[in-house]
Amino acid sequence: MQNISIVLVEPQGPINVGSVCRCMMNFGVSDLRLVNPCDDYRSLESRRMALKAERILNQAAVFQDLRGALADCHLAFGTTRRFGKYREDFLTPEQSAVQALSQPPDSTVAFVFGREDRGLHTCELDLCQAFVTIPTDSDYPSMNLSHAVALFLYELRKG
C-alpha cells in the first residue's frame, strides 16, 4: 500500500481532512495530497479528528492544482457520483482496487476525491485514467468525503 496516494481536491472543512487522515492510518496508507485545501486544514479540529494520525496531516503535500498533484502518478482513479461527459465506463471500488493492486510496486497510484459540495470538475476527471463510482441509493447518492475514502481503502486492504 506504499504506492497508494489519496488526493483531496479543495477539501472545504478541516474535520473531513482530519477524518481522512485517520482512515488512512487505519488502512496503512500515508501519502496524502491536498489540492488547494481550506486555510484551516491543520486546525485543532482537524488534529482532533486525525487523533493519532497527525503524522499524515503534518506530512500532507499541498498543490495548487490537480495536475501538479498527479505529476508523478502512473494511474489515477477519479471518483464521481455524476454520470455525464466521458463518464460512461465506471469501475466499482472493488474493481478499481484490483487494478490498483496489479500495478508494479514502484508505480504511484492515486485515488482522487472531489469537493464535498460538487465533486470533481470534468476537466479534473480528464486528468484521470479511470472513473470510479460507489453504488449508493439514488435518493441520497452523495457520501461524506472521509466515508468514501474509507470504503476505497477497505477495498484496497482486502485486496
Residue spans for each PLM region:
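Post-transcriptional modification and biogenesis factors for structured RNAs
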Residues: 1-159
